Regions:
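RNase H-like, metal-dependent nuclease domains and their acidic two-metal-ion catalytic environment used
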Residues: 1-77, 81, 85, 98-164
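Short, surface-exposed amphipathic charged segments that create phosphate/polyanion-binding patches used
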Residues: 85-94
C-alpha cells in the first residue's frame, strides 16, 4: 500500500556476530520518499550494503539511489529465504542482538504478527503478512540489513586507489 518506508540497520562485528535495529520508519503520505535517498546517500561512505527486495515498492527509488552513487543489492526470493533463515539461526545461536521493545515498537509488532510462507520446496521461507492491516516492513528491512551486512564484500574502511 506504500504508506510507510522503512530502513533497517545492521552492524556486523569481526567475530561474525551482528546487531540489528529499525533505523527509520516514516509515513510516506507525510514525508514522501526522497528523505530515504538523502539519508542513504549520507550513510553510503560508511555502509557495506544497501539492500532492496525485488518485490518491494522501494524499487521505485533505484534510479535516484543509483544517481546518488549508491550501489544497491536487489534480492530475489531465494535471497530472502537465506536471509530469513540466517536471522532465525543467529537469534537461536545467540549471535544476533537487537534493541529492547520500548525503542523499537514497530519492529516488535512486526515480529509478533509476521507469519512465514514457503519459498520453493527445500525448506526456505519468507516473512508474510497475516492480513492486509499488518505492516511487517520493519522485520523485512532488518532481515535484509542483516543479509547485506553478512554477504557484502564491500569494505567502506578500505583505502582505495584509482589508476588512470
Amino acid at each position: 500500500e506504500r504508506t510507510r518506508l522503512t530502513i533497517g540497520a545492521c552492524m556486523r562485528y569481526e567475530d561474525d556476530t551482528a546487531h540489528i535495529e529499525l533505523a527509520e520508519y516514516r509515513d510516506t503520505r507525510r514525508d514522501g520518499t526522497m528523505w530515504a535517498v538523502n539519508l542513504l546517500a549520507k550513510a553510503w561512505d560508511n555502509a557495506s550494503a544497501v539492500v532492496i527486495d525485488e518485490q518491494s515498492p522501494a524499487t521505485s527509488l533505484l534510479p535516484e539511489l543509483n544517481n546518488a552513487g549508491i550501489q544497491v543489492t536487489v534480492t530475489r526470493s531465494t535471497d530472502m529465504g537465506r536471509a530469513c533463515g540466517r536471522l532465525q539461526d543467529m537469534l537461536r545461536d545467540g549471535t544476533l542482538t537487537h534493541l529492547p521493545e520500548d525503542g523499537q515498537h514497530q519492529l516488535w509488532h512486526a515480529v509478533r504478527k509476521a507469519t512465514i510462507r514457503p519459498i520453493g520446496k527445500s525448506g526456505m521461507f519468507g516473512w508474510n503478512r497475516p492480513d492486509d492491516d499488518t505492516d511487517i516492513s520493519p522485520l523485512v528491512a532488518c532481515t535484509l540489513a542483516l543479509h547485506g551486512a553478512m554477504t557484502s564484500q564491500r569494505d567502506p574502511t578500505r583505502q582505495q586507489e584509482a589508476w588512470y
